[in-house]
Amino acid sequence: MISIADLREVFRGDVKISASLAEHSAFKIGGKADIVLKPLDKADAINVIKFFHEKQKPHIVLGRGSNVLISDDGVREAVILLSGCLEKVDINGELVYAEAGVDLQKLAVQSLNHRLGGLEAFSGVPGSVGGAIVMNAGAHGHEIFELIDWVEVVRDGSLKKLRKNEIKARYRETDLAQDTVLSARLKLKPISEKEQAECFERRRELMEKRRNSQPLSLPNVGSIFKNPPPYNGESRQFAGQLIEACGLKGVREGGAMISDKHANFIVNLGNATASDVLALIELAKTKVRLRFGIDLELEIKLIGFTEHVEK
C-alpha cells in the first residue's frame, strides 16, 4: 500500500480512498479503487506516474472511460484520472496541440472553428484524445494516426516525445498500450470557408447517422469487438452484422443487453454489472465462432479482472 504522506511529497492533486469507478466509466459500471488520483495539471500527472514507477507499484490511467469495462470487484491498483485536468489545447497554424484528457468531439469542433479539417471524420466517436491515440481510433475509413505529428508519453518512468514514424499503429491498436499518453500534436488541413461549411455539414450528417444507428441514449462504451480482418480476398466484415446474423440483437443478461439498434454495442439498462456484460461478450463470441468460424477480438479494454478472461 502506498503511503499517502509519501505520495503528497510529489502529488498536488485530489486523492480519494476507496472510491467508486462506475462514475468514471461510460458504462456506469465498476467497483471501487483503493485509491483514485486526479492531477492538477500535466506536470502533476508526470510526477505521480514517475513516483509509481520508481516505487514499482502498478497503476491504471483512465481518460473518459469510453473504451473500458471495469470489474465489479474494482481494482487494487491506484487509478489516475486524466479527464478534467489534462485538457489544454493550443492551435498554431495547421498544428494542433492537445493534452490527453481533451474530449475528441470538442477538439473536432474547435479545429473546424479555426478552419482546420481532418477530425470531422471522427464525429460522434466517444472518448479522449489520449484514449483515441492509444487504440488508433477510426471511423469512416480514417484513423487518428493519419493526423499525428508527435505523441508525448511516459514510458518506463521517463518522459518521451515520439514522432509518428517511431510508433507502430495498426487497426484499432498501437504499441503505446504500456505507456501513458500525456499529449499529442496533430497536423490538420487548412480549409476554405466553403470547405469549413461543408465539413460542419458532414459532421452534422455523421452525428445524425450515429443517433439513428447506435444506442446513444443508454450507457455504453462504443464498439465491443473489432471488425474481423478480410478473409480470402473479401472486404472487411463487420462484427455487428455477424452478431446480428446469430439472432442476438436484444438479448439480455441481467441489466445488460446486446443493443437492438446495433449488435456490436452492449448497453446498461440501469443496473448492469460487469459480469452481465462479460456473459453477453462470451455469448456473442461463441455464437459467431460456431456459425462463421470467426474469433471476434475485443476492442474494449478489461480492467480489474483477476481471473483469466478470453480477449
From Swiss-Prot:
Keywords: Cell cycle, Cell division, Cell shape, Cell wall biogenesis/degradation, Cytoplasm, FAD, Flavoprotein, NADP, Oxidoreductase, Peptidoglycan synthesis
GO molecular function: FAD binding; UDP-N-acetylmuramate dehydrogenase activity
Gene3D superfamilies, A to Z: 3.30.465.10, UDP-N-acetylenolpyruvoylglucosamine reductase, C-terminal domain, Uridine Diphospho-n-acetylenolpyruvylglucosamine Reductase, domain 2
Pfam families in UniProt: FAD_binding_4, MurB_C
Active site: R172, S223, E299
Major localization listed first in the record, in broad terms: cytoplasm
Broad enzyme group: oxidoreductase
Catalytic activity: UDP-N-acetyl-alpha-D-muramate + NADP(+) = UDP-N-acetyl-3-O-(1-carboxyvinyl)-alpha-D-glucosamine + NADPH + H(+)
UniProt-listed InterPro entries: FAD-bd_PCMH, FAD-bd_PCMH-like_sf, FAD-bd_PCMH_sub1, FAD-bd_PCMH_sub2, MurB, MurB_C, MurB_C_sf, Oxid_FAD_bind_N
Segments forming domain FAD-binding PCMH-type: 29-191
GO BP terms, alphabetized: cell division; cell wall organization; peptidoglycan biosynthetic process; regulation of cell shape
GO terms for cellular component: cytosol
Compartment(s) where it occurs, according to its Swiss-Prot or TrEMBL record: Cytoplasm
Pathway given in the UniProt record: Cell wall biogenesis; peptidoglycan biosynthesis
E.C. no: 1.3.1.98
Cofactor(s) of this protein: FAD
Keyword Oxidoreductase carried by entry: yes
Function field: Cell wall formation.
NCBIfam families cross-referenced by the UniProt entry: murB, PRK13905.1
Family: Belongs to the MurB family.
Protein name, entry field: UDP-N-acetylenolpyruvoylglucosamine reductase
